[in-house]
Amino acid sequence: GLQLTSPLLTAWWFLACSTNMALPPTINLSGELTLITSLFSWLDITVFLTGLSAFATTTYTLYMFSSTQQGTLPPNIKPSSPSQTREHFLMLLHLLPSAGLATNPKLTAPQ
């Protein structure tokens, strides 16, 4: 897969997928935990459906990552030039706000 052509971009893609799967310490994890605890006061079926949707999201994200990054390179994709620093800087700028909110959730609270 694409891991053979750009291993560092694969690492960035894995970090983005991990954030989507609500792995600790991401802001998605705190959101899903808050949602699930608030659903305990409702019907039991809502907790089950929320857990099922979280499982489906995680399964789809893992499938998407492994199908694009692992295995052999498809014949229609030609290896490209190595990634530039600006692409890695752009990925860092996308993940820094999420990391900042995960480490300090009070950043979103009004003063």
Swiss-Prot record:
Question: What EC number(s) is this enzyme filed under?
Answer: 7.1.1.2
- Name the InterPro entries for this protein: NADH_UbQ_OxRdtase (IPR003918), ND/Mrp_TM (IPR001750)
**A family per Pfam:** Proton_antipo_M
Where in or outside the cell it occurs: the entry states: Mitochondrion membrane
Q: Which GO terms describe its molecular function?
A: NADH dehydrogenase (ubiquinone) activity; ubiquinone binding
Bilayer topology reads: Multi-pass membrane protein
Q: Catalysed reaction(s)?
A: a ubiquinone + NADH + 5 H(+)(in) = a ubiquinol + NAD(+) + 4 H(+)(out)
GO biological process annotations for this chain's record?
ATP synthesis coupled electron transport; electron transport coupled proton transport
The UniProt keyword set, sorted, is: Electron transport, Membrane, Mitochondrion, NAD, Respiratory chain, Translocase, Transmembrane, Transmembrane helix, Transport, Ubiquinone
> Under which main EC class is this enzyme filed?
translocase
- Spans traversing the lipid bilayer: 35-55
Please describe what this protein does.
Core subunit of the mitochondrial membrane respiratory chain NADH dehydrogenase (Complex I) that is believed to belong to the minimal assembly required for catalysis. Complex I functions in the transfer of electrons from NADH to the respiratory chain. The immediate electron acceptor for the enzyme is believed to be ubiquinone.
Matching PANTHER family, A to Z? Answer: NADH-UBIQUINONE OXIDOREDUCTASE CHAIN 4 (PTHR43507:SF20)
Task: Please state what the protein is called.
Answer: NADH-ubiquinone oxidoreductase chain 4
Instruction: Give the source lineage, highest ranks first.
Output: Eukaryota, Metazoa, Chordata, Craniata, Vertebrata
